[in-house]
């Protein structure tokens, strides 16, 4: 039985991994947290007390899996502060678009990280 989504993992070279860490901490608002001492380099980023995004360094000769580009669209985070995030994205020159789903009472912001992964922020506050 599936109980819920645990985390996403994004894998990249070391330089891109550092840039992704900075983006998800400074723009999305995740925080850097504890990560077990794995043999590989990486980070665990947290929303509150839950690790939700893992960043891992690609090993030297690891080939990119071609199907990944064709299947991944976006990750979604529950968020508060629609105006705060809209301003933050504008201030950082990050293109985004806004959407509403009145039937379920949500407002959404969609944008991309520095390597093109889609991000959705879902707001349910009135």
Feature annotation, model-predicted:
Residues 1-21, 73-75:
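N-terminal beta-strand motif that seeds the catalytic metal site of vicinal oxygen chelate
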Residues 68-89:
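Mid-chain, well-packed structural core segment of small domains
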Residues 25-33, 94-95:
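Conserved acetyl-CoA-binding loop of GNAT-fold acetyltransferases
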Residues 38-42, 71, 103-107:
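Short acidic/glycine-enriched loop/turn segments that link adjacent beta-strands
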Residues 1-3, 90-126:
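Vicinal oxygen chelate
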Residues 31-66, 118-124:
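Conserved short beta-strand elements that form part of the metal-binding/catalytic scaffold
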Residues 20-27, 89, 116:
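Conserved active-site tyrosine of GNAT-family acetyltransferases
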